[in-house]
Curated annotation (Swiss-Prot):
ATP binds at residues 470-477, 744-751. The keyword Magnesium does not apply. Interacts with PEX1; forming the PEX1-PEX6 AAA ATPase complex, which is composed of a heterohexamer formed by a trimer of PEX1-PEX6 dimers. Interacts with PEX26; interaction is direct and promotes recruitment to peroxisomal membranes. Interacts with ZFAND6. Its main location: cytoplasm. It catalyses: ATP + H2O = ADP + phosphate + H(+). Transmembrane segments: none annotated. It is found in: Cytoplasm, Cytosol; Peroxisome membrane; Cell projection, Cilium, Photoreceptor outer segment. Component of the PEX1-PEX6 AAA ATPase complex, a protein dislocase complex that mediates the ATP-dependent extraction of the PEX5 receptor from peroxisomal membranes, an essential step for PEX5 recycling. Specifically recognizes PEX5 monoubiquitinated at 'Cys-11', and pulls it out of the peroxisome lumen through the PEX2-PEX10-PEX12 retrotranslocation channel. Extraction by the PEX1-PEX6 AAA ATPase complex is accompanied by unfolding of the TPR repeats and release of bound cargo from PEX5. This is Peroxisomal ATPase PEX6. It comes from Cricetulus griseus (Chinese hamster). The gene is PEX6.
Amino acid sequence: MALAVLRVLDPFPAETPPLAVLLPPGGPWPATGLGLVLALRPASESPAGPALLVAALEGPGSQNGQRGPGPPQLLVSRALLRLLALGPGARVRARPVRRPPALGWALLGSAPGPGPGPRVGPLLVRRGESLPVPGSRVLETRPALQGLLGPGTRLAVTELRGRAKLGPESTQHSRLPPPPVASSFAVSHAVRQLKGVLGGTGDALGVTRSCLRGLGLFQGEWVWVARVGEFPNTSQPHLAKVQLLEPRWDLSERLGPSSGQLGEPLADGLVFVPATLAFNLGCDPLEVGELRIQRYLEGSIIPEDRGSCSLMSGPPFARELHIEIVSSPHYSANGDYDHVLYRHFHTPRVVQEGDVLCVPTVGQVEILEGSPEKLPRWREVFFKVKKAVGEAPDGPASAFLADTTHTSLYMAGSALSRVPLLPSGRSTPWDSLSPPGLEALVNELCAILKPHLQPGGTLLTGTSCVLLQGPPGSGKTTAVTAACSRLGLHLLKVPCYSLCADSSGAVETKLQAAFSRARRCRPAVLLLTAIDLLGRDRDGLDEDARVVATLRHLLLDEDPVSNCPPLMVVATTSRAQDLPTDVHTAFPHELEVPVLSEEQRLSVLQALTAHLPLGQEVNLLQLARRCAGFVVGDLYALLTHTSRVACARIRASGLAGGLSEEDEGELCAAGFPLLAEDFGQALDQLQTAHSQAVGAPKIPSVSWHDVGGLQDVKKEILETIQLPLEHPELLSLGLRRSGLLLHGPPGTGKTLLAKAVATECSLTFLSVKGPELINMYVGQSEENVREVFARARAAAPCIIFFDELDSLAPSRGRSGDSGGVMDRVVSQLLAELDGLHSTQDVFVIGATNRPDLLDPALLRPGRFDKLVFVGASEDRASQLRVLSAITRKFKLEASVSLVNVLDRCPPQLTGADLYSLCSDAMTTALKRRVRDLEEGLEMGSSALLLTMEDLLQAAARLQPSVSEQELLRYKRIQRKFAAC
């Protein structure tokens, strides 16, 4: 992509679209009368992601053409500059787009009145953009966010109402003009108090234009900044420059579901404070708080070696600067950083005694050559200012400028110090101080670690060791990283699998080396991931006493009288029960990653999709409900799978031969949204894989249309489950039933009923067969029962369906096992059922053929207190409803009469019998189709039809699965329990 400079043409030609560019004569691109399409993006942005497609037309003559050497100039309107979030003279990267994507479908919004007129030729449009037709806007496009609207585009038109009628241009023109600023500088000496937030780049305070006018300051002016606290001398004032903060380029947001809105405006009452300045001020990075700002008036900078003179006040230059390198686990304190420091101080920097300086190392490979340790290059190196001496050693100045011309730099020794949080530049939600879904966990970690950093923290009793447990992918490492960033602590990550060795002595040596390395860069947190891997022998069966003793000694070994900053240890595990007892008891603090609620899953999805273009039909709230039981890593994997599905959909939407490499490149430049169907397909794939791996619950796809008859049973089930969900205020009155028992002959649809309830009520469904919970090992059967209810609580709202409940919970005292396993399982099941009253959104449905074999305690109020009999269909009307539900997805001939089919069937039929009838008829139809294909009587592409003859043959062979004597026995059981 070639570099180009944007130049505002004012006034812009009225006959030219406002979001087009004019090409100068003699430029690098052919300027023809028909024009071409250019892909533009700011020069500072990475080439990944979508670009802005604009129409490039032939510009005016040589009087407005390019003059002199340098990049070519593009003549643009102010509306295009606002969309790019750039100013006049900004540089962009531009490349011609040979084949812009053609839009297959577009949704247009039109104001009340006549709709859009006839189209004349292709038109380059973008989602959220106003059309040349008055009152019309592009609301949605397929398959790309930008492309050509032509004769082959299918259009859908809807009516715009309210503020949706206004495009971004009209909202800009509707603002009131800014007030005059000629007299606002009369109050420049006053002390102003603003609220600071962590943000901005470099070493300057970032403010908006209106805030800059309100402060009465100029761009680049020096100010004193101090933190406002409870005491007058809460923090030492620091010097900083004031810079105008411009909005950031993000085409995905500008072409996102907000339909052309330019994002949230910057708040005028806020000042954006860089991370290093906030750290030196002593501010909390999560909430910078109130700042006191005053203009610097102590002197003026008059450089002698330059032709111009600035009368703005500025700090003096330092004659000497003494610094110490801050010890860190990410770089060597003994390395040669002369070249890095020289390049950093080539630009004058503000220094004050006691400050921590951040020196970036990006693009500087010299530190790798001189590093005595084999460490990868870290993106920044920290130094602490020990002393700064001005030209007048006895002068009152406390802040200086340091550069390579006026200052002599001295570096000796190292220091132990906290360091500020710096943004990584990747702009991911996991790098924030409060990762979405993990805010409460990070707060708990900070509350445990912070007291040890306060003055006198070494006198606290107990060690600062924390055990963090949670399933894989739940965000344990992310939470620890965020807590360390918030507290300014060094973080040394050590995976415990790297500490494992063939002998106990080797493991002991590696452990001591890891702790020794962490102590050299205190205050620090040593993060031991998967600590359950330590303390076991090579077979993994017995404990390694030597390793356990060493690890316990290292965890508890703290010198209470040491003046050094503390070393804190955080260990993570997904199987806390596998930890040796001596290691487990060495952690006085134990935290568990909480299960993500629906609101937390929504916040994670919103953070992950913040910079992704989504289709208008994507409902993140509904998606969060379907992701019940997911951890943070699962939601991240969902977005990855969705992107792959979207790419596959785009490739499949091309011609028969597929999209060429050039077409794929142009489509990626235009950008394409993630649709609801992409999320649905990815979610199905992920849930299937997750369910097969760990038995996670999922929402079934069974509706009431799949259940024929049983109207009374449906009503009783919905009153038990749906009523508390729709009216939670009834729970305070005690009107709650958490258990429901379905009993009756086999094959009557008890399992199908439970699945249909889960689907209709949007509940996850966890099906448990009774015998699969029984285990030969002592205590494992009870653990399996507890695990089932734990998974259900994690996936709430959820239905636990116990099939064959009589095999899991028979009457106690009658089992034949010598160890009393079944009695303990029944007791554990009763305890879990009693604990459901504290969990509002977990319901239990049991199914059995023999309720008389169940333990009587299960049928008492508060447990399975609602018994519902699901019997066989005895009348033709109910049998017809069941048969119609089964055959609703079949292709039936017009001559098929289900009533006549039922007349040939036995009188007593269950749902399983009718399903067997349809399955037998389908098998007969398949045999007939194969025979006709072999004889050439029928084409294979035609649909398979069920004929009346197929159904009648199956009805003639049908035998009821439940005899009349068995049905009578089930009815006697029903009357027995109904009388209780």
